[in-house]
From Swiss-Prot:
GO CC terms: cytoplasm
Pathway annotation from the record: Amino-acid biosynthesis; L-lysine biosynthesis via DAP pathway; (S)-tetrahydrodipicolinate from L-aspartate: step 4/4
Residue positions binding NADP(+): R36
Organism (species): Wolbachia sp. subsp. Brugia malayi (strain TRS)
Top EC group: oxidoreductase
Protein name per its UniProtKB record: 4-hydroxy-tetrahydrodipicolinate reductase
Highest taxon above the source species: Bacteria
Cell compartment(s), UniProt: Cytoplasm
Gene: dapB
Length: 264
């Protein structure tokens, strides 16, 4: 029996790619799809929402509750406000939730995860999550003898800075080094000397860059760089679908807060 997956934010850049991945994946079927109120896709078949050539028999809706009620697991890539509505619906219907929504620092996910299975990751790319494991291991080997700098670049419409992915790298390194996570951004008008033990961040924004990340370990003799470049957003969509399948098959009866690190 196929896993019924709902999609919140189906008319967005990520939502469309997730629907495409669901359409081509033989393990799942689309249970429902939500677009924002006022979207031109409301009431239309989801086939047209993802530029698919044929109708799929499911209409795009604005009702988050309806989609959670009819789904085995739901994928959300939206905003903080919409994610809060998703969490409430997930609690009501006991539906596992996968989310890649960022800028949610004020939401206490652990509170909700005590009642329902939630998988949240700032980046659903398998490659980025493999890199995260490598970064942790590098930090353990190198200890506090190296300065750490994290650079990220994204498209010119991205709102959060540094990116959620860059922050996850920083937290993982701080944890491996057993130090407090103190993100540090050096500005051109600052006269402060680089403080030892702080994790530096540099941010670039431009064009349509999907996502570049570089983690550097530097001392006076050498520099080690670990890099990842996302070529297409499909990598995030594919990872999100993989996460949804994993969450439903392995944790649907086990409340908790999971991440892509558990999946790969």
């Amino acid at each position: 029996m196929k896993i019924k997956v709902g999609v919140i934010g189906c008319s967005g850049r990520m939502g469309k790619r997730i629907l495409n991945e669901l359409i081509t994946n033989t393990q799942v079927e689309i249970a429902g799809a939500v677009a924002r109120l006022g979207s031109k896709y409301i009431g239309s078949d989801i086939g047209s929402a993802v530029y698919h050539s044929s109708n799929l028999g499911i209409k795009v809706t604005s009702s988050i509750s309806d989609v959670f009620e009819s789904s085995d697991v739901v994928i959300d890539f939206t905003t903080k406000e919409c994610m809060l509505a998703c969490l409430k619906a997930a609690m009501k219907f006991k539906t596992p939730l996968v989310s890649g929504t960022t800028g949610i620092e004020s939401i206490n996910l652990k509170k909700y995860a005590a009642k329902i299975p939630i998988l949240w990751s700032a980046n659903m790319s398998v490659g980025v999550n493999v890199l995260l494991k490598l970064v942790k291991k590098a930090a353990e080997f190198l200890d506090n003898e190296y300065d750490v700098e994290i650079w990220e670049m994204h498209h010119n419409l991205k709102k959060d800075s540094p990116s959620g992915t860059a922050m996850e790298f920083g937290k993982a390194i701080a944890n491996a080094l057993k130090v407090d996570f103190q993100p540090y951004q050096h500005s051109h008008n600052s006269s402060n000397i680089r403080e030892k033990g702080k994790i530096g961040f540099a941010v670039s924004r431009g064009g349509g860059v999907v996502g570049d990340h570089s983690v550097m370990f530097i001392n006076s003799d050498e520099r080690i760089e670990l890099n990842h470049k996302a070529i297409d957003r499909t990598t995030f969509a594919r990872g999100a679908v993989r996460a949804a399948i994993w969450l439903y098959e392995n944790k649907r009866e086990t409340p908790g807060l999971y991440s892509m690190q558990d999946v790969i």
